[in-house]
Design a protein with these regions (language model features):
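Sec/Tat signal peptide C-region and signal peptidase I cleavage site
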Residues: 28-32
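Gly/Pro-enriched, hydrophobic low-complexity segments
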Residues: 125-242
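Bacterial N-terminal signal peptides
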Residues: 19-27
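Flexible, processing/modification-adjacent segments and terminal tails
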Residues: 33-48, 58, 66, 75-153, ...
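Bacterial N-terminal signal peptides that target proteins for export
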Residues: 4-20
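Sequence/structural signature of outer-membrane beta-barrel proteins
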Residues: 61-63, 192
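Extended beta-sheet lipid-handling architectures
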Residues: 53-56, 67-69, 84, 187-189, ...
Length: 243
């Protein structure tokens, strides 16, 4: 009788563990579906913007560099044409073509979305979602998005690439939020991945000139901030702008 009772208890325990495992797997699958749906909702919102021309102020904060705040013009044309031009004719070209374009964060449609909990960005609650490209040859290895689920806005994104290191973007939104376009973008990166624009000069704190600019920039952190004051959306942008 005791043996039967033990066997029955063992069977019930194994059955319970199997049910828990199945429930956990089903729950993970549903969560993955939910975050994929959220990413696609954000993509649909950004896809409403076919092109824009924006103006704003650009501030560069990089060690050993003297870069004044500049007025800039920014152009975008779907799906991946993007250019920043400083007034005076100097184009700003981060190494590898790193872009402040929101749509570039969701360029690939071949990805696996993995839920990674919740967090807060600038006091706003967000869903944390990791995007893993299914293409083994893709330059992007991992993108972590912090999405405001209620407003369908990307408030922060951290991207790791094969060729250009890891960079982070944090966004603030205002009147252009319904288009998914930020009022402010702060772009943080490792300075070894940054290509110096023409006309930028070094400032030396010790009076001693370093061996090379590359040595001065090695293992330093940099930030580029753009504060937009206006966008002209879906009014057409000539292809000549990008040449």
């Amino acid at each position: 009788m005791r043996r039967l009772t033990y066997r029955a208890a063992s069977f019930l325990m194994r059955k319970s563990l199997a049910n828990i495992l199945l429930f956990s797997m089903a729950s993970l699958h549903l969560h993955a579906q939910d975050v994929t749906t959220l990413v696609n909702r954000v993509r649909t919102k950004l896809d409403k913007v076919k092109d824009y021309h924006a103006t704003g102020d650009l501030k560069t904060d990089v060690a050993f560099l003297k870069v004044p705040v500049s007025r800039v013009n920014v152009w975008y044309k779907s799906p991946d044409r993007f250019r920043i031009k400083k007034e005076g004719g100097i184009s700003l070209l981060p190494k590898g073509g790193l872009s402040f374009n929101m749509r570039s964060l969701l360029m690939t449609e071949n990805f696996t979305a993995v839920p990674a909990g919740e967090s807060s960005v600038g006091g706003q609650p967000t869903k944390v979602i990791k995007l893993l490209p299914t293409d083994d040859d893709a330059d992007i290895i991992l993108t972590t998005l912090y999405i405001d689920e209620k407003l369908e806005l990307i408030r922060r994104a951290t991207t790791t690439t094969r060729e250009n290191g890891t960079y982070d973007m944090q966004m603030d939104y205002g009147r252009y939020g319904p288009w998914g376009l930020p009022d402010k973008v702060v772009f943080s990166f490792n300075t070894k991945d940054y290509k110096l624009p023409k006309g930028v000069t070094f400032e030396y704190e010790t009076g001693e000139k370093p061996a090379t600019p590359e040595e001065q920039l090695r293992n330093k952190k940099g930030k580029v901030e753009i504060r937009y004051d206006s966008y002209t959306i879906n009014q057409g942008v000539p292809e000549s702008v990008f040449k």
